[in-house]
Amino acid sequence: MATTSPSAMDHVSKKPKLADGEDAMDVDDKENRKIAKVAFDHETHMRIYYDSLFPAESMMKWLAYGNDLKHPQADAGFMQRREFCFTLPGDVFVRYQSFKDDKELRKELKSKLPSKIDIGPVFNVDPSKRLAYSGGAGSDRVFAPTEREFVMDIDMTDYDDVRTCCSAANICGKCWPLMTVAVKVIDAGLREDFGFEHLLWVYSGRRGIHCWVCDDRARKMSNESRAAVAEYFGVYKGADASGTVKRVNLTSPLHPSLQRAYADVLDPFWRRKILPDQELLTHEKTKDAILAMIPDAEARSRVESAWKGSDDSVARWEKLEQIVQRAIKADAKNYALRRCLHDIVFAHVYPRLDVEVSKHMNHLLKAPFCVHPKTGRVCVPMDPKTADDFDPMRVPTVNELLNELNAADGKVEATRMQKAVDCFNETFWNALEKECKGDLAAKTRENAATKGASATEW
């Protein structure tokens, strides 16, 4: 990575301090109102960021999947078929760009200074030449995607009916555990149920999380296969016509993957974090919605009576469980009642995906390491194994990184960006790079064996 002299950054404001007693994880809304602002000049600061901090080399190595190597089996034109989309200030979209290497990418970043970078699929031809391949149905000259990472998008706004602490773009330490649950459940499902190995988890910079599944077979999946994988996690089905009763797609007994999710993640988080922090059973709106999910009128009435004291949500949940379980013993064939405890937990805590993002190969998704234009936070990789410890409020902003770079005399390795790149490598790229190199070596051996067989036949 390039370095920047201290003099180039003398104008950057120092990192703001939080007020006494204020927790960095208290609240972060779309205007960052509770985190002191510093002056931000897009042109000046983003040019320094793209020149000195943005890990263009790591990004291009990943997206090339070994095809950037001078190897006889590498696809030399692979990267120039990958679409990049820049969003420029003023919401100007520049689509169908491609770059042969990290130097070319960095040059364009410094020139255009995008406020957002999106990554698209690998096409059959250079996307800049697409107009020559738009012959339509039946034509031999068709412009079409050939591969793309399978991606998942989880957004906190989809949980607004569960959150009592925040809404819309706001996030805090009380609702962020919903994202932690999503990472844990989806990561386990993709690895254990589908056998995927190379998953890159990225904080979106504001209120959500993205997952990039980068195994070769994931990148080659059809749109139909992508939809099937996404729907596998589609347990929550929204509210009923009344808008009150939440609907989930569960069986009794639970599917093994859902039983694993419930036992390992959902139930512990529900009791330890969600119930006490969101106070779901003391807030009038959420309390009534949960009561409405008890299908037996008599059991529902008993729960309501048991809640007339001043108990907290955890104590109220325990009473609800006891009453429902007694009702199940009295009517073992009431399958809706037998399922209702699971229904309540899954409806409130199970991951809620934006399925449309996952279904189509040509969907654009924000690139890792770009900067969220509303918060200034960098879209940093996450380690799913330590998802409990991830605090979005402590993710660095551009200004903070520039201050760190200035204080370290331009040494990138002394900034938190280096930690983000280390996380990218250690949790994701190192293993995938080894596999990519192994695949190229295997192709070389296969070709040598084929040539040897042909020579023998001749």
Task: Please give the residue ranges for each predicted region.
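HIT superfamily nucleotide-processing domains
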Residues: 184-188, 391-393, 399-401
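Signature for HUH/AEP ssDNA processing cores
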Residues: 2-204, 216-223, 228-230, 235-347, ...
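Residue-level signal for beta-strand positions within conserved beta-sheet cores that form or flank
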Residues: 197, 207, 363
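Residue-level detector of short, conserved catalytic/binding motifs and their immediate flanks
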Residues: 150, 209, 365
